[in-house]
């Protein structure tokens, strides 16, 4: 994925009313996130499940400033991304209709490992979860945090 495509994908994910399912519909219909933003309203209206509110929200230019800030954070923190159409996207997630468009990871993680715990929806780990991980119960497995 090019920097430009990552930028537009991050922007698409910032559009109000666009989650992973809608984003994938738009990307698959238009070809990529860059083309989603370049598409005419009449073309977007033909996509099943894409309503006038989402089409209107795609015109919100503030999503690009948010995407730029996200790109800077990714570079600053040395975070890598895996796109849902990438060859190395986890096989088990490819079969989930609502799997993330982008995975973010820090460090060297084998996303195809057979024993993995996924934590979805949080960037702040709770005290209870910290205790659970430190207890040694899950030492030989990888942990994913999706947010």
Feature annotation, model-predicted:
Residues 138-147:
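Phosphate/pyrophosphate-binding betaalpha-module
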Residues 1-134:
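Short, positively charged patches
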């Amino acid at each position: 994925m090019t920097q430009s495509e990552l930028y537009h994908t991050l922007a698409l994910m910032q559009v109000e009313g666009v989650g992973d399912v809608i984003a994938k519909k738009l990307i698959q219909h238009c070809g990529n996130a860059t083309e989603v933003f370049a598409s005419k309203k009449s073309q977007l209206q033909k996509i099943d499940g894409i309503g006038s509110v989402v089409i209107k929200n795609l015109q919100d230019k503030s999503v690009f400033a948010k995407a730029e800030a996200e790109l800077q954070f990714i570079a600053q923190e040395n975070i890598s991304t895996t796109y849902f159409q990438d060859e190395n996207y986890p096989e088990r997630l490819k079969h989930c209709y609502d799997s993330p468009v982008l995975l973010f990871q820090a460090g060297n993680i084998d996303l195809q490992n057979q024993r993995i715990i996924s934590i979805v929806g949080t960037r702040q780990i709770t005290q209870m979860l910290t205790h659970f991980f430190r207890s040694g119960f899950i030492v030989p497995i990888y942990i994913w945090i999706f947010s």
